[in-house]
Structure formats: structure tokens, C-alpha cells
């Protein structure tokens, strides 16, 4: 089975997930599988069944636009020095109750493209499965109560050079297609010193944030069109739909619309806690970002880490 990288891709069931980390940023994931749930590309924000490859180009030109509306400005800023790269492979298959017993992974081609060069990885995987009775992850189709808070607490530590967060609370977000925008809007309110929004207010804020993010795509078309998969106008039109999932481009845009940093976390069973996998908008500060938890199958929840907080900059709301 030959699998090519596709930018930030997830699949809800029977999935093989390959993650490529550049430094502390999760830069690419590929998922492939078949079930009643579609494979989903976070970079495109659209539901698709199969992926055969991808291309990435990186702009070194920072640009900014300011808006006097509810949310702030957007600034593209990419590092020019490529950080250390790491390849991870994980397997998700709860209904089939399968686990991976053997993996042979061979790098076939690796070549880079950053606006002038091309980035791609082709990986050959030989996968042998054996049965197990344990489920790999929770069902993404569940619809959580926005006030459903789950608290986890223990001492912090490090794993493979990354900090592991073990004292945290997960704020359940409904899986209605708005979960990314709901999670960011929820975190925005808390970071701004406001009360946690109720379900109705959370939905309204999420839809407003989605609209502003889509508007920024249009306003900054020359700088954003390169990382939108497929037709740009179609992509923007579809991302305005309140039930279409958002992903990495929307998180990237949201950080600049809000002028606040956003950090994405995932659970790491080997580490025994949460680790950060992506960071956006760090030019607005690195302390106390908006935090969201990504579950690896297309769903986001709001996240609180219980640690001493640094001073919080003024909101642009």
C-alpha cells in the first residue's frame, strides 16, 4: 500500500494516520480507510474519501490586513529555517477491534518545496493486524453537552523533549460541524475574562468567527490560495456553511482574526497526558493561548490547563 502525505488529514474510523512533525508543529497527516465516516482533510476543510498526494508551498512574505469589526487582523508569518522533522505512524480502528502487530516503513522519496521547492513524502507501509478487544478512541458521532467538563489531574512531566500536561479540564463541545469554531470561541471568551458562553451564545460566536475567517480568506486571496486544496472560491463558499468542518487553515486564520495565540493539543497514551501538536499566532504572545483539544478523528473540544497564568493581553473583541 502506497500512501502519500496530504496536509493535516483525519479519518474517523478504520484509519491509518501518519503524522509529520516539523519542530513543535504538526505539519502533515494522512489518513486512509473506508467506513460510513468520510476521511477528512483539515487543510481543505472538506470531506473526501481518498487522498493520493499533496503539494505545499510556503510564503516568506509577511502581510497584514486590519479590520474594525468584532475580530482583529491577520498576519502570515512562516519561518525560513526548516526545523527538525519527525515521522510518526498511528493506527485507529475501534469497530474492527484491531491493533497493529507489525509495521515496516520505508521512505521512498523525500523532497522539499517552500514556494521555490516541493515538499512530499511517499511512504510504503506493510501492516499486519491482530485482534484486540480494546477500543482505540471515542466515537466522533457523539454529541457532547457544551457544559460537560471532565477534569484530569496529576504532576506534569516531559516525554521525548515535549512537555506533558496532566492537570487539565476538557470542556465538551457539540459535534455539529462547528466544533473547531465553538472551541476557539469558548477559549476566546475565557481568555478575555468573560464568562463561559452558553450553548446558544457559543454557537452564535462560532458562526460569527467562521464568517470572519472566510472573509479573511477572500481579503488575502493571493497569500492563502496556495494552501487551499481545489478551487479557492468553492472552498471559501463551502467553509461558510456552519456544518462544514474547519481545520488548520481556519485555526491559522482565527489566531490572526482574534489577535491571540492558539495551541492545539492531543492525548498521547505513551506520554500519559496531553502534548501540544500545533501553535498559531505566536507573534501575539506565547503565554496563556486559546487551547483546544484535537481527538484525531475530526473533533475538537475546548481545553483548560490548570497552571499559573501569565498576564493576559487585552482582547480585540
Curated annotation (Swiss-Prot):
Database matches in SUPFAM superfamilies: Cysteine proteinases (SSF54001)
Which residues of this protein are catalytic?
A: 176, 179 (nucleophile), 299
This protein's GO cellular component annotations are: chloroplast
What's the record's pH-dependence note?
Optimum pH is 7.
Q: Which UniProt keywords apply?
A: Cytoplasm, Hydrolase, Ubl conjugation pathway
Which InterPro entries does the record match to this protein?
OTU4_OTU, OTU_dom, Papain-like_cys_pep_sf
**What are the GO MF terms of this UniProt record?**
cysteine-type deubiquitinase activity
Q: Which residues form a coiled coil?
A: none
Q: Which reaction does it catalyse?
A: Thiol-dependent hydrolysis of ester, thioester, amide, peptide and isopeptide bonds formed by the C-terminal Gly of ubiquitin (a 76-residue protein attached to proteins as an intracellular targeting signal)
Identify the residues that the record assigns to the OTU domain, covering every copy.
168-306
Q: Its principal location? A: cytoplasm
A Pfam family that the UniProt record links to this protein: OTU
Q: What does this protein do?
A: Hydrolase that can remove conjugated ubiquitin from proteins in vitro and may therefore play an important regulatory role at the level of protein turnover by preventing degradation. Cysteine protease with a preference for 'Lys-63' over 'Lys-48'-linked over 'Met-1' ubiquitin (UB) tetramers (e.g. Ub3 and Ub4) as substrates. Also cleaves RUB-GST fusion.
Cited PANTHER family: HIV-INDUCED PROTEIN-7-LIKE PROTEASE (PTHR13312), UBIQUITIN THIOESTERASE OTU (PTHR13312:SF6)
What name has this protein been given in UniProt?
OVARIAN TUMOR DOMAIN-containing deubiquitinating enzyme 4
Record organism: Arabidopsis thaliana (Mouse-ear cress)
Give me the gene this protein comes from.
Answer: OTU4
Amino acid at each position: 500500500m502506497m500512501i502519500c502525505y496530504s496536509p493535516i488529514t483525519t479519518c474517523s474510523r478504520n484509519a491509518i494516520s501518519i503524522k509529520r512533525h516539523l519542530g513543535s508543529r504538526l505539519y502533515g497527516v494522512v489518513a486512509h480507510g473506508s467506513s460510513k465516516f468520510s476521511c477528512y482533510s483539515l487543510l481543505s476543510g472538506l470531506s473526501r474519501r481518498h487522498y493520493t498526494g499533496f503539494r505545499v508551498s510556503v510564503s516568506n512574505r509577511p502581510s497584514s490586513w486590519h479590520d474594525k469589526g468584532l475580530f482583529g487582523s491577520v498576519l502570515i508569518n512562516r519561518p525560513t529555517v526548516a526545523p527538525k522533522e519527525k515521522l510518526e505512524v498511528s493506527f485507529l480502528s475501534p469497530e474492527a477491534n484491531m491493533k497493529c502487530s507489525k509495521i515496516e516503513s520505508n521512505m521512498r522519496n523525500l523532497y522539499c518545496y517552500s514556494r521555490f521547492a516541493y515538499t512530499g513524502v511517499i511512504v510504503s507501509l506493510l501492516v499486519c493486524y491482530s485482534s484486540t478487544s480494546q477500543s482505540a478512541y471515542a466515537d466522533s458521532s457523539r454529541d457532547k453537552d457544551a457544559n460537560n467538563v471532565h477534569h484530569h489531574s496529576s504532576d506534569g512531566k516531559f516525554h521525548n523533549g515535549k512537555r506533558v500536561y496532566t492537570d487539565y479540564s476538557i470542556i465538551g463541545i457539540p459535534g455539529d460541524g462547528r466544533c473547531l469554531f465553538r472551541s476557539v470561541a469558548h477559549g476566546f471568551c475565557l481568555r478575555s475574562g468573560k464568562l463561559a458562553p452558553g450553548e446558544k451564545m457559543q454557537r452564535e460566536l462560532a458562526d460569527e468567527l467562521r464568517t470572519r475567517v472566510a472573509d479573511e480568506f477572500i481579503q488575502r486571496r493571493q497569500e492563502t490560495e496556495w494552501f487551499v486544496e481545489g478551487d479557492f472560491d468553492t472552498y471559501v463558499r463551502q467553509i461558510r456553511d456552519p456544518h462544514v468542518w474547519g481545520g488548520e487553515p481556519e485555526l491559522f486564520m482565527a489566531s490572526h482574526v482574534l489577535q491571540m495565540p492558539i495551541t492545539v493539543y492531543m492525548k498521547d497514551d505513551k506520554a500519559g497526558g496531553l502534548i501540544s501538536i500545533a501553535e498559531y499566532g505566536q507573534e501575539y504572545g506565547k503565554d496563556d493561548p486559546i487551547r483546544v483539544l484535537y481527538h484525531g478523528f475530526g473533533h475538537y473540544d475546548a481545553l483548560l490547563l490548570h497552571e499559573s497564568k501569565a498576564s493576559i493581553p487585552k482582547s480585540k473583541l
